[in-house]
């Protein structure tokens, strides 16, 4: 039950500040923290959290309200390089950093996660 957002145009260092706030929290608590955090990364992480909850509900038949943020990782993506003109004909490089955000939801110990997922061909034939 995970969700990944790749090539997000936010500095990994700034995104990690918000990611550290929700690590280990329950899904409702993490969603509430992100809703009231006044940072651009909070909105991005909120979208990834919602996506992970939707994946848990649709793919694993799990109730997102019972899950918690098991892992949230912000890795560095490729850096977009731009140049800014400076004095005396010089130029300096501007680095626009990108992030890869991975968020995994898990169930606390002893709590079953959803039902079995039905796949075609699993039914036993009756004779």
Swiss-Prot record:
Q: Locations of Low complexity compositional bias? A: 106-117
Could you give a GO molecular-function term held by this entry? structural constituent of ribosome
Annotated keywords = Ribonucleoprotein, Ribosomal protein, RNA-binding, rRNA-binding
| Family matches, as InterPro entries | Ribosomal_uL22, Ribosomal_uL22_bac/chlpt-type, Ribosomal_uL22_bac/org-type, Ribosomal_uL22_CS, Ribosomal_uL22_sf
Classification via Pfam families: Ribosomal_L22
- Region: Disordered, residue numbers: 106-127
Q: Which GO terms describe its biological process?
A: translation
Give the record's GO CC terms: cytosolic large ribosomal subunit
What does the protein in this record do?
Answer: This protein binds specifically to 23S rRNA; its binding is stimulated by other ribosomal proteins, e.g. L4, L17, and L20. It is important during the early stages of 50S assembly. It makes multiple contacts with different domains of the 23S rRNA in the assembled 50S subunit and ribosome.
Q: Which family does it belong to?
A: Belongs to the universal ribosomal protein uL22 family.
Q: How does it assemble?
A: Part of the 50S ribosomal subunit.
Name assigned to this protein:
Large ribosomal subunit protein uL22
Record the organism: Rubrobacter xylanophilus (strain DSM 9941 / JCM 11954 / NBRC 16129 / PRD-1)
Designated gene of the protein: rplV
């Amino acid at each position: 039950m995970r969700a990944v957002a790749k090539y997000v145009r936010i500095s990994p260092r700034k995104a990690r500040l918000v990611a550290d706030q929700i690590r280990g929290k329950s899904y409702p608590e993490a969603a509430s923290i992100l809703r009231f955090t006044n940072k651009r990364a909070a909105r991005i992480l909120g979208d990834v959290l919602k996506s992970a909850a939707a994946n848990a509900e649709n793919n694993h038949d799990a109730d997102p309200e019972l899950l918690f943020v098991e892992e949230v990782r912000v890795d560095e993506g490729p850096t977009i390089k731009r140049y800014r003109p400076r004095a005396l004909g010089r130029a300096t490089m501007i680095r626009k950093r990108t992030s890869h955000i991975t968020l995994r939801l898990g169930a606390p110990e002893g709590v079953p996660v959803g039902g079995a997922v039905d796949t075609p061909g699993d039914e036993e034939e009756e004779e």
